Design a protein with these regions (language model features):
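Acidic donor-binding/catalytic loop of UDP-sugar-dependent glycosyltransferases
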Residues: 2, 33, 76-93
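Catalytic donor/gating beta->alpha subdomain of glycosyltransferases that bind UDP-sugars
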Residues: 94-127, 160, 164-235, 304-308
């Protein structure tokens, strides 16, 4: 509830003409004070859309977009803080009629200085690099859910199980529209600092993405979707296949260890790396944070999430 108040105040401070800005807060059957908080801001132009029945984020998005009046719909999360100029940075890209979505740059803030938070920031810096390259080469295959804008006329309702900020780029590409990355449009969000919270979040997102990839498997055919297919395969499919490759590497290494000292050393290095990750997990739970455990912990956490999903 505190985050929601701060989010609405932050949105009201955006540098954009008030008469051209509609702020719509979607509440998915909230049972706390969410709706009452939003109503407090109604005199300042904030609208409440209450979705009955707890249908989930994606269905709520679908129904909220149908009630929005603008030509461009900007999606956000209640926990995200925008820079005041995000709209002025995002919107010019829509002057290109081939652009259907513009995604901004998310910067994670690790207030707790946790190893999980540091790992998430490192991972996201790499993810941001990939997004920038995809945008220049062809099109984004996924946006950051806390900061992306879409042409309302091109938005299509999605099934409830979808990871909406990922699937939207595929749906737009089917219509011949690109999704681009605008790094100067910036938002901030706190990282998770507990391994269990980060694991839960990653499992949820990855399981939804698996569903989206399966339902859009035709888009992974380069003959149909060109370089977009290459991006989907390299960015998502191969990434989620890493645990299988790591398992195969470990098993083959075990079988070959007796044949060569080199293989024995490599096996020992693998086991040591996984032990470091385990130590990082245990120590993080009791509040002990060692910097050299950041990479092993988050690498194993992210790949374990792919397996669980």
């Amino acid at each position: 509830e505190t985050a929601l108040r701060a989010k609405i105040e932050n949105t009201l401070c955006l540098e954009y003409p008030a008469d051209k800005l509609e702020i719509l807060v979607a509440s998915d059957g909230s049972t706390d004070a969410t709706d009452d908080i939003v109503r407090e801001f109604e005199p300042r132009g904030v609208r409440l859309f209450r979705q009955e029945g707890r249908v989930g984020k994606t269905e709520t998005h679908n129904n909220a977009v149908a009630r929005a009046n603008g030509e461009i719909v900007l999606f956000s999360d209640a926990t995200t803080e925008y820079e005041p100029d995000v709209l002025r940075k995002l919107l010019p890209a829509f002057a290109d009629e081939s652009v259907g979505c513009v995604a901004g740059r998310l910067i994670y803030v690790d207030k707790a200085s946790s190893n999980v938070g540091k790992g998430a920031r490192s991972y996201w810096n790499y993810e941001t690099f990939i997004k920038s390259a995809e945008s220049k080469a062809c099109s984004l295959i996924g946006a950051s859910g806390c900061l992306y804008a879409v042409r309302k006329a091109a938005y299509q309702p999605m099934y409830a199980e979808a990871c909406s900020d990922f699937l939207v780029c595929t749906m737009l590409y089917r219509q011949g529209l690109r999704s681009v990355f605008e790094p100067s449009a910036v938002c901030f969000e706190d990282t998770n600092h507990r391994p269990s919270d980060e694991m839960r979040m990653r499992v949820r997102v990855i399981s939804q993405t698996y569903t989206d990839l399966w339902r859009n498997i035709d888009m992974m055919n380069p003959l149909q979707s060109g370089f977009f297919a290459v991006e989907l395969i390299s960015h998502k499919v191969l990434r989620y296949a890493v645990p299988l490759l790591l398992f195969a590497l470990l098993i083959s290494n075990i079988l070959l260890a007796r044949e060569s000292v080199v293989f024995s050393i490599i096996l020992a290095a693998q086991v040591f790396f996984y032990l470091l990750a385990l130590a990082g997990w245990v120590l993080e739970r009791i509040g002990v944070r060692l910097k050299f455990l950041v990479i092993p912990l988050y690498f194993v956490l992210a790949n374990l999430a792919s397996v669980i999903a």
